[in-house]
Amino acid sequence: KNLKKFYKDIKKVVRDNNYDYVLRMSQFSISALDLLAAKQGGATHLIMRSTNSQITGGTLGEMINKLFSWMPRIIPTAKFGPSTESADFLFGKNSVKNGKAKVIHNAVPINNFIFNYDIRRKKRKELGLEDKNFVLCHIGRFDEQKNHKFLIDVFNEVYKRNNNAILLLVGEGVLKEQIKNKINNYGLQKHVKFLGLRNDVPQILMASDVDVFPSLYEGMPNTIIEAQATGLPCIISDTITKEVNISGNIKFLSLNSNINEWVNEICTVNLERNDMREIFIKSKYDIDSVCSDFINIVFENEI
């Protein structure tokens, strides 16, 4: 609300605490202004991470982002994103290819996500799920970007084919009540579970049979990386970067395709689960590998 005061406050905090390294994570180009304030406060290492591949805020947001697009390209001393797409979005076209920015994957503590049948059975029982239930899950805030309306349309058709289908929705958000109304209009309220914000996401993913993620856009969705870590098959929109396909167990579908194409893919997923530890370590999506990359890029070879 008060940009000038905010700028001064950042500068003061950095100066008073003698911070040398400052990290700013954002999808907005104007956020690089915070790093400029940090620089004036004495910080010499200005790190910026892009968090998305598209702007939110409609036309006005796009205009503001374009107006300040120069800032994240010249102010940070180190620049990175979770995918090539997200890095190029904030730091300029071909920023990764030209060596102006780096990709540091969204990583997971892989040992926490290795699929375990005992954990699956225990969590399904806790959630009131039966062995016969075919469980779809979606993890994401109730926001236009996550496209819950489309998800509910898809689930309605899945349920028509398999009345043992259950949908788990993890998250909170401003559109939650609107989505509840849509579910009630379909008469699906007994077949959709709102789980809220959780600290047992790995277990919920293990309890599920397929992850459905029809986002309008994403940078690099962490929830899909986590889902793959548990060996869960994922059906996701083709608006999402192909870089997210670590396991080879992802199906990309167009949001413009016939809804039955989504339903067919969901209803015919392979329910077999595999240990993903080796693949994640080799692909540098485990937290230990990524930490060393982060240290190298941010603290040693700044861009």
For every predicted segment, state its role.
Residues I224, P233-S237, K242:
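Short hydrophobic beta-strand element within catalytic cores of glycosyltransferases
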Residues E130-K146, I152-F155:
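Conserved donor-binding/catalytic core segment of Leloir-type glycosyltransferases
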Residues V22-A43, I55, N65:
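An aromatic- and histidine-rich active-site surface loop
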Residues L197, L216:
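Aromatic "clamp/platform" in nucleotide-sugar-dependent glycosyltransferases that forms part
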Residues P76-F115:
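A short, active-site helix/loop in glycosyltransferases that binds the activated sugar's phosphate group
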Residues E272-I303:
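A charged, aromatic-enriched C-terminal amphipathic alpha-helix characteristic of glycosyltransferases
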Residues I114-L129:
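A short helix/loop element that forms part of the nucleotide-sugar donor recognition site in Leloir-type
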